[in-house]
Amino acid sequence: MARRTKEDAAVTRELLLDAAEREFCERGASRTSLAEVASAAGVTRGAVYWHFRDKSDLFSAMCARAKLPLQTMLERAGNTPQDDPLETLRELMTTALVRLATDRRSQAVFEVLFHKCELTGELAPIAQRRQAERSLCLAHVERLLQQAIDAGQLPPDSDTSLATHALHAFMSGLMREWVLEKNAYDLAAVAPALVEMTVTGLRNDPPRRPGRVRPRVRPRSCTAT
């Protein structure tokens, strides 16, 4: 009996998360009440509070369900020595884009995150959590870039912080724009080429830390004939 109750609770929790995705995506997170989420899930408002403290807790759980697999992969890559760090980075970036392009749950969550979420009022606590998640993501990527330096794939004076922020801007910007206009191009098909372009640029000419002057290429002197 206890096992059945636990299973029922897990099912109810998933129903609430599914309903939150739909309602937040349709109405916007700040304009959707917990009562509306409960109604869409076919449960009582009390069931919402059994599983989640408030709207921000529900919102966080919805996001975590969609992003957790990729976050786990990134954390493992950053904290584990890689034979080919830049190849690992390329694979992670490509996987993230392909997942977004092919997984409706990811699309719904990122559409809410990017375009239908005002982090004020009930959702104000989300801003701090998102900043913490972003900082953790950047830290894992920077560790991966440091591994690339240690492996001789990037120069010792590469500015890993600047490169990390540039990669994050590329990924978040691309995902934000594609979610806004999904029919513009086939993201799953072009993801490998887009990522390869970015990683190749990083490999060939990474940003350098200031204070170390790179040698200038002088033009050859012309001699009269």
Residue ranges of predicted features:
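Short secondary-structure transition hinges
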Residues: 94, 98-143, 153
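Amphipathic alpha-helical packing segments from all-alpha helical-bundle domains
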Residues: 68-71, 75, 83, 87, ...
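Amphipathic alpha-helical segments enriched in hydrophobic/aromatic and basic residues
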Residues: 24, 33-34, 45, 55, ...
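Hydrophobic alpha-helical connector segments
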Residues: 61, 75-108, 160, 164-167, ...
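C-terminal peripheral helix-coil segments that are non-catalytic and often amphipathic
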Residues: 91-99, 135-151, 165-225
